A protein has these predicted regions:
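Active-site SXXK
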Residues: 48, 59-91, 252
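Structured C-terminal helix/loop/strand segments within mature extracytoplasmic catalytic/sensor domains
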Residues: 18-28, 32-34, 50, 132, ...
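Mid-domain, small-residue-enriched loop/turn segments at the edges of structured enzyme/sensor domains
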Residues: 127-189
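Conserved catalytic neighborhood of penicillin-recognizing serine enzymes
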Residues: 94-129, 136
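Acidic helix-start/capping segments at beta-turn-to-alpha-helix junctions
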Residues: 84-99, 133-134, 160
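C-terminal motif of bacterial Sec signal peptides marking the signal peptidase cleavage site
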Residues: 13-16
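Short, conserved catalytic-motif segment at the N-terminal edge
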Residues: 36-38, 42-58
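Positively charged n-region of N-terminal signal peptides that target proteins for export
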Residues: 1-4
Length: 284
């Protein structure tokens, strides 16, 4: 009986190693096909199964950080206080603010700031969220309290999108970002109402339609936040992916870039990476 148990354990171990090797090879093929660097952290929260690839490599996170900043503000703001007024001045407005540019010298609300940054990736809205949190000093304190000493928020929008691979500013790793995303949004730190509000925004935004959503099986529900830096072809997407009938999501972080500063990003790198990873989770 003992020999049988050991044999079964060995077979399962070999099978797991074989699957991991196959996943690695498939992701390397995506890198080679597009001459890109790919980083992945994926966690099936229903089974605790992980898929990782270059998970400790640093990438510019770009606008994907808006998911973390929005979650932090929702963490500290009760749902019945989301209509708290916030004044928008002309000096607040930065490039790419399609919503907030209509509110110059007017009041908006915390709820509207989060909607603007998550649905439309409004840069001014995210800057104002950071200010509501007490600035990056407080944001970094919160990250460290979540055991994230890797993610390095530093600059406001839009400067944070000017990625320099020689600097750690405004970068993270897929693994660090994914674990923090999971802790903040999925692990019970938000009220039920605020979590539902944020996840619904991530489902309904359209900026990620060509990214993880495109690579996911048709019957999977995807709640995502995309990001794109202005250098090194940085293109990212972070998501909670819900297989059909599942209430517990797959946490998926995909960061990509290229070696040339003026190289252009390609959404297919992200979508094809997502397809590889999610097919592995979908294998029976």
């Amino acid at each position: 009986m003992k020999k049988l148990i050991l044999m079964i354990a060995s077979i399962l171990l070999l099978s797991a190693c074989s699957t991991a090797d196959a996943t690695t090879q498939d992701l390397k093929k995506v890198e080679d096909k597009y001459d890109a660097n790919v980083g992945v952290y994926a966690l099936n929260t229903a089974t605790d199964k992980e898929i990782t690839f270059n998970e400790d490599k640093r990438f510019a996170y770009a606008s994907t950080f808006k998911a973390l900043s929005s979650a932090m503000l929702l963490e500290k703001t009760p749902h019945n206080e989301l209509n708290k007024k916030v004044h928008v001045s002309k000096e607040d407005i930065v490039p790419y603010s399609p919503v907030l540019e209509k509110f110059i010298n007017k009041d908006t609300s915390i709820k509207k700031l989060i909607e603007a940054t998550m649905l439309y990736s409004d840069n001014t809205a995210n800057n104002m969220i950071i200010e509501e949190l007490g600035g990056y000093k407080e944001v970094n304190k919160r990250l460290k309290s979540l055991d994230d000493k890797t993610t390095k928020p530093s600059r406001m929008e839009p400067e944070l999108n000017n990625y320099n691979p020689k600097s750690n500013r405004d970068t993270s790793t897929p693994q660090a970002f994914g674990k923090t995303l999971n802790k903040l949004i999925n692990d019970g730190r938000l009220s039920k109402e605020n979590k539902t509000f944020l996840i619904d925004l991530m489902i309904n935004n359209k900026s990620g339609d060509t990214l993880i959503k495109k690579g996911a099986p048709k019957n999977f529900k995807v709640a995502d936040k995309s990001g794109q830096a202005i250098t090194y072809a940085s293109r990212n997407d972070v998501a909670f992916v819900y297989p059909k009938g599942e209430s517990k999501p797959i946490v998926l972080v995909i960061f990509t870039n290229k070696e040339g500063k003026t190289d252009k990003p390609n959404d297919k790198v992200v979508s094809e990476t997502a397809k590889v990873v999610l097919e592995k989770f979908n294998d029976k």
